[in-house]
């Protein structure tokens, strides 16, 4: 690449000619002591006019990506920074009374650009509507437009347009600029469009995108990833725009933007889970700087901020700027400019010669100003100064990047940092890098104290740590401060007779009629009200998508069409899924919801939590647990959360009230109908009957002879006859399942269609607590639990993968968030291979795991892949161990709350008291690995030219080591993929132990390496053979193929498994060549 345009135009001879621009020599020349404010601002005004505004399109207001050669393309995020640069200088000119019209000019240059982007976006309103319903790379807003016409450029196949960070940055700067007094939004069409952009951004936590660098994963192969920088910018934008009036001081109630607090909170949790990583393939990335610092200031946790920033600086900072990320091939001489995507392992070529970008020194300068760290400002200003160049007029220019010329590449790789780098003065990237120019203006205005941080951050995205407790924030970025929140609780009984019954136990409740005129709504009615938010027929926008309202949303009071409305949380909905019939699970959900509200409630005013008590909750054995919970409410503390129980009318004064004024209904429009929660009416003096809900003895068992194996081959007539005679619900479900598969759901039985008959059996079995029958019926009806997709997302954002499918059968790996419909199809396709009940119990586990991993992530340490089928296998194994010599309890007969407790039991890492066979079986089923396991496999691979083999799966040394880095998430997943072929949990755990042994042996013997493939199966076989020889010699036991005794042997100690594994590993290594060392004392000469 020595003859590349970049190299040619960077030569000293050409720089001296002045035809492009020269190194900046005058930047440190002393200015007059008596320089006036006008002179200072005039200096920057001329820079802005000459290096930025002269390139702004006179028609759209957009800025081109390149400033030479008639460039047609304009990228949204670059134009946004240009607008911000002009706006920042306008803010400085506000300090001068007679500004000669410059404030107006600069402000309206920014407004023109912002409205230009809005114009481009609004022409794609159909894409917003599609993306809102189905977020995919082929339904998103474009990120590149024609600079002169605003037309969309480049198809989805030609360019990765899915860049949520661009939309988020637009919303963030929109709020900041309007807050400073600019008028950008003109009418209600634009307000409704912005509201719909918010709907799109709310779901960022589950939408992998291409990121700031437009490349997706680090491998640049067209795949998308969940990026911390995108999620962080979305979080910041949502916090800034929540409750914001787009008309500024002249606004009214219907120009206010609404944000779903629960969706925002999921973005917050996702961001904290991903950091300090940027994504699965990016261990760190300079794109995190604008996320954690200016302009987003997305982090509330100071420790996490420091950890993330330190990692960026440590790994990416150089003499000429920051690398974007490690092994970034962008504009390096070894990158092929004619290919959009890289080949496998190609990124290894760019290791150590990544371009360095001075723009990130500017971000660090701005960060220093905001944090009052003058040393940081000076440090990065001193680093930046020698990198700046100047135009022929003498104005400073920030080069886009500095690169290593082709002739110097080998020397740079041998000795990093030794070679001179050259700036990207022109060539493919144009004369000026406008993003850098804009940020230079902002940084210098701040450093010279011509504007203050409060000027360019009027909504106070950045708040110093010492002020965070006292600042009136917009609900959510006050951070994880310790709080002593008291949750207000109102107890509502569904009928008057239930109220009287509870009163006899000293539990004071209210009925829906007694709280009037306040109405009690299920959250689904609130969702219906929100359908009207952002609706716009002219633009073809339908308003808020059908998404449930979470615990934070239902903890507010709403004013809707003159009514005062409170909502009970979704956990009290009468779900179609059987888990809601387990009252112990309901109590657990209530405690979890209260703890969640305590942790994440950041609003002024107290949360209002409605507890809805139904008559069905207190029947039979359900009564005592419910009574204990209500007594805990009365005492004022439940699950570690302080609560205050009172009448709803009393609590309403301290709550947060949300005015839903977007429900503007004209006289000609029909009022939307909302159904409030109705009180159950019963005859006077009737009493609540606490009838038993325990299973009748005959119902609990199958009728003799009714098995799927026997009856699936009998005629339909025979099955119908047996169905009519069968009084056992379990038998009926089996027979109905056979009919369903054979004849279809609409086949007529004595009790209507097959599907209706199964539904009735499902209800009856639920009331009798016949959980195995309930699960089979639920599976036959293809029922799906609520919150399935969010639960899987909770697992994914913790850096894990989820696999669905039965143990020993094909599994589906989920790496990115999916829609509920897709997850349902996977579950019912993969899980019903050998037992119909598997599909629904896997859903139960997904819900439980989603909750547990959010609240106790340490229980999943060492588990990179959450294999649901294998976890079920571990639970069944645990039941066998507990049963001893007796028949094991059937997992499917346990209640959902018992299943959850069993899951928690096996997840506990301390398994002391168990035999080693049981430990290995459980840990293998959970896919648990020791600390630093994947790093050690990397080190093994470095010393194994032909790779590693296990269970027929080969992990090659190349291109693995070339394509990846040691600490990369994708390498760990590759190792998991290799181990995924092992079909026995305890054997998998022995393989994990073997890999740790191999790593330690290689670490202590640097002169050794494997000459051939490391066949792990062969090594275990040889170790077991050695173990058998010792067993037969010492204990006089005949050799057996059964490895149970080996699995049950402790790893350490005399004749532990590690002793045998170490022996065979050393034998294998010593069969190869020993590499001599200069320090080897065995050498004679």
Swiss-Prot record:
Q: Does the keyword Transferase apply?
A: no
Instruction: Quote a single Gene Ontology cellular component term.
Output: plasma membrane
> How the protein sits in the membrane?
Lipid-anchor
Any one Gene Ontology molecular-function term assigned to this protein's record = calmodulin binding
InterPro entries associated with the record? 6-hairpin_glycosidase_sf, GH15-like, KPBA/B_C, PHK_A/B_su
Question: Phosphoserine modification sites?
Answer: 10, 19, 693
Cell compartment(s), UniProt: Cell membrane
Q: Where is the lipid attached (S-farnesyl cysteine)?
A: 1082
In the UniProt record, does the keyword Phosphoprotein occur? yes
Q: How is it modified after translation?
A: Although the final Cys may be farnesylated, the terminal tripeptide is probably not removed, and the C-terminus is not methylated.
Biological process (GO) annotations held by this record are: glucose homeostasis; glycogen metabolic process; positive regulation of glycogen catabolic process
Biological or metabolic pathway of the protein: Glycan biosynthesis; glycogen metabolism
Q: Which UniProt keywords apply?
A: Calmodulin-binding, Carbohydrate metabolism, Cell membrane, Glycogen metabolism, Lipoprotein, Membrane, Phosphoprotein, Prenylation
Regulation (activators, inhibitors): By phosphorylation of various serine residues.
One matching Pfam family is KPBB_C
Q: Where is this region: Calmodulin-binding?
A: 760-787, 912-943
Q: Just give the chief location class.
A: membrane
Q: What does this protein do?
A: Phosphorylase b kinase catalyzes the phosphorylation of serine in certain substrates, including troponin I. The beta chain acts as a regulatory unit and modulates the activity of the holoenzyme in response to phosphorylation.
Q: Which family does it belong to?
A: Belongs to the phosphorylase b kinase regulatory chain family.
Subunit structure of this chain's protein: Hexadecamer of 4 heterotetramers, each composed of alpha, beta, gamma, and delta subunits. Alpha (PHKA1 or PHKA2) and beta (PHKB) are regulatory subunits, gamma (PHKG1 or PHKG2) is the catalytic subunit, and delta is calmodulin.
- Protein name, UniProt field: Phosphorylase b kinase regulatory subunit beta
Q: Which organism is it from?
A: Mus musculus (Mouse)
């Amino acid at each position: 690449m020595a003859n590349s345009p970049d190299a040619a135009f960077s030569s000293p001879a050409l720089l001296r000619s002045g035809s492009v621009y020269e190194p900046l020599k005058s930047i440190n020349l002393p200015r007059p002591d008596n320089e006036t404010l006008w002179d200072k601002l005039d200096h920057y005004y001329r820079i802005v006019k000459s290096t930025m505004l002269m390139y702004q399109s006179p028609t759209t207001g957009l800025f081109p990506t390149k400033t030479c050669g008639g460039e047609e393309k304009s990228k949204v995020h670059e134009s946004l920074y240009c607008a911000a640069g002009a706006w920042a200088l306008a803010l400085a000119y506000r300090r001068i009374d007679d500004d000669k019209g410059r404030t107006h000019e600069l402000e309206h240059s920014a407004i023109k650009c912002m409205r230009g982007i809005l114009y481009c976006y609004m022409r794609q309103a159909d894409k917003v509507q599609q993306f809102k319903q189905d977020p995919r790379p082929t339904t998103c807003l474009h990120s590149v437009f024609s600079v002169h016409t605003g037309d969309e450029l480049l198809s989805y196949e030609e360019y990765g347009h899915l860049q949520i960070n661009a939309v988020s940055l637009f919303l963030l700067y929109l709020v900041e600029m309007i807050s400073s007094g600019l008028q950008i939004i003109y009418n209600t069409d634009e307000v409704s469009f912005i509201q719909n952009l918010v709907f799109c951004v709310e779901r960022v936590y589950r939408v992998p995108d291409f990121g700031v660098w437009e490349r997706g994963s680090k491998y640049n192969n067209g795949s998308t990833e969940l990026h911390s920088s995108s999620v962080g910018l979305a979080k910041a934008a949502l916090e800034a725009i929540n409750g914001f009036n787009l008309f500024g001081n002249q606004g009214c109630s219907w120009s206010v933007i609404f944000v779903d607090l629960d969706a925002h909170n999921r973005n917050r949790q996702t961001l904290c889970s991903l950091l300090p990583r940027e994504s699965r393939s990016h261990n760190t990335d300079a794109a995190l700087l604008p996320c954690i610092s200016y302009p987003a200031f997305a982090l509330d946790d100071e420790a996490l901020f420091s950890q993330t920033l330190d990692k960026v600086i440590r790994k990416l900072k150089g003499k000429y700027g920051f690398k974007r990320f490690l092994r970034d091939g962008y504009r390096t001489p070894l990158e092929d400019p004619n290919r959009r995507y890289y080949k496998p392992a190609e990124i290894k070529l760019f290791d150590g010669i990544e371009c360095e970008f001075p723009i990130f020194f500017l971000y660090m300068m701005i960060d220093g100003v905001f944090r009052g760290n003058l040393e940081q400002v000076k440090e990065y200003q001193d680093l930046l100064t020698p990198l700046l160049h100047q135009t022929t007029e003498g104005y400073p220019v920030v080069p886009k990047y500095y690169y290593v010329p082709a002739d110097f590449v080998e020397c740079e790789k041998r000795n990093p940092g030794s070679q001179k780098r050259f700036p990207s003065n022109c060539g493919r990237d144009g004369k000026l890098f406008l993003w850098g120019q804009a940020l230079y203006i902002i940084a210098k205005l701040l450093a010279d104290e011509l504007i203050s941080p409060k000027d360019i951050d009027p909504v106070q995205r950045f708040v110093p740590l010492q002020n965070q407790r006292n600042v009136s924030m917009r609900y959510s970025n006050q951070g994880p401060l310790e709080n002593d929140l008291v949750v207000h609780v109102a107890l509502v009984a569904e009928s008057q007779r239930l109220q009287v019954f509870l009163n006899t136990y000293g539990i004071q409740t209210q009925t829906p009629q007694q709280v009037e005129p306040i109405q009690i709504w299920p959250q689904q009615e609130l969702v219906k009200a929100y359908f009207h938010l952002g609706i716009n027929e002219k633009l073809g926008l339908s308003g808020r998508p059908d998404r449930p309202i979470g615990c934070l949303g239902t903890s507010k009071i709403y004013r809707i069409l003159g009514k005062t409305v409170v909502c009970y949380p979704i956990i009290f909905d009468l779900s179609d899924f059987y888990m809601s019939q387990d009252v112990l699970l309901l109590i657990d959900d209530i405690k979890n919801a209260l703890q969640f509200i305590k942790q994440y409630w950041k609003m002024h005013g107290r949360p209002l939590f409605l507890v809805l008590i139904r008559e069905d909750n207190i029947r039979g054995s359900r009564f005592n647990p419910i009574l204990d919970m209500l007594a805990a409410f009365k005492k004022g503390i439940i699950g570690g959360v302080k609560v205050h129980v009172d009448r709803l009318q009393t609590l309403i004064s301290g709550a947060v009230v949300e005015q839903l004024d977007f429900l503007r209904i004209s006289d000609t429009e029909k009022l939307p109908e909302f159904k409030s929660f109705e009180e159950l009416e019963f005859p006077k003096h009737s009493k609540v009957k606490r009838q038993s809900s325990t299973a009748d003895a005959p119902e609990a068992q199958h009728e003799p002879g009714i098995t799927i194996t026997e009856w699936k081959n009998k005629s339909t007539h025979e099955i119908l006859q047996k169905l009519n005679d069968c009084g056992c619900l379990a038998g009926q479900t089996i027979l109905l399942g056979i009919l369903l598969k054979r004849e279809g759901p609409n086949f007529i039985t004595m009790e209507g269609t097959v599907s209706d008959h199964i539904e009735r059996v499902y209800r009856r079995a639920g009331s009798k607590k016949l959980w195995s029958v309930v699960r089979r019926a639920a599976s036959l009806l293809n029922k799906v639990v609520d919150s399935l997709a969010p639960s899987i997302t909770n697992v994914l954002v913790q850096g894990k993968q989820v696999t669905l499918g039965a143990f020993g059968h094909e599994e589906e790996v989920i790496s990115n968030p999916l829609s509920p419909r897709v997850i349902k199809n996977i579950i019912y396709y993969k899980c019903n291979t050998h037992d119909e009940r598997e599909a629904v119990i896997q859903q139960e586990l997904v819900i439980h795991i989603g909750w547990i991993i959010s609240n106790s992530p340490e229980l999943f340490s060492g588990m990179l892949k959450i294999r649901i089928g294998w976890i079920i296998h571990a639970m069944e194994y645990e039941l066998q161990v507990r049963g001893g010599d007796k028949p094991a309890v059937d997992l499917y007969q346990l209640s959902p709350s018992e299943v959850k407790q069993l899951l928690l039991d096996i997840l506990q890492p301390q398994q002391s008291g168990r035999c080693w066979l049981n430990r290995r079986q459980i840990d293998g089923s959970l896919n648990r690995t020791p600390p630093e396991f994947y790093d050690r496999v990397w080190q093994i691979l470095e010393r194994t030219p032909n790779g590693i083999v296990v269970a027929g799966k080969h992990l090659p040394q190349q291109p693995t080591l070339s394509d990846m880095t040691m600490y990369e998430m994708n390498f760990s997943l590759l190792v998991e993929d290799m181990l995924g072929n092992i079909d026995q949990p305890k054997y998998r755990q022995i393989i994990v132990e073997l890999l740790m042994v191999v790593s330690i042996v290689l670490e202590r013997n640097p002169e050794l390496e494997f000459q051939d493939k490391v066949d792990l199966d062969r090594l275990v076989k040889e170790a077991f053979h050695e173990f058998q020889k010792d067993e037969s010699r010492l204990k006089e036991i005949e050799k057996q193929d059964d490895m149970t005794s080996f699995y049950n042997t402790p790893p350490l100690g005399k004749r532990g498994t590690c002793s045998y594994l170490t022996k065979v590993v050393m034998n294998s290594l010593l069969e190869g060549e020993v590499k001599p060392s200069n320090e080897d004392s065995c050498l004679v000469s």
